[in-house]
């Protein structure tokens, strides 16, 4: 049975534009995400 193509096609520029720090800082919800991750002690805050 055929599976189809792989759906994850890595692209660093797209990754940064969709999940990056600058994008997170744009909205109130995004800023809260970053602050939550800071409080939790995450090593990486955003993509």
UniProtKB/Swiss-Prot annotation:
Family the entry assigns: Belongs to the bacterial ribosomal protein bL34 family.
This protein's UniProt keywords: Ribonucleoprotein, Ribosomal protein
HAMAP family linked to this entry: Ribosomal_bL34 (MF_00391)
Cellular component terms (Gene Ontology): ribonucleoprotein complex; ribosome
Keyword Plastid: no
Annotated Gene3D superfamilies: 1.10.287.3980
An example molecular function term from Gene Ontology annotations: structural constituent of ribosome
Source superkingdom: Bacteria
Gene name of this polypeptide: rpmH
Organism: Mycobacterium leprae (strain TN)
Pfam families given in the database record: Ribosomal_L34
Protein name: Large ribosomal subunit protein bL34
GO biological process: one example: translation
């Amino acid at each position: 049975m055929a599976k189809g193509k792989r759906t994850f096609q890595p692209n660093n520029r797209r990754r940064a534009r969709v999940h990056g720090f600058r994008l997170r800082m744009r909205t109130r919800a995004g800023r809260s995400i970053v602050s939550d991750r800071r409080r939790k002690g995450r090593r990486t805050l955003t993509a």
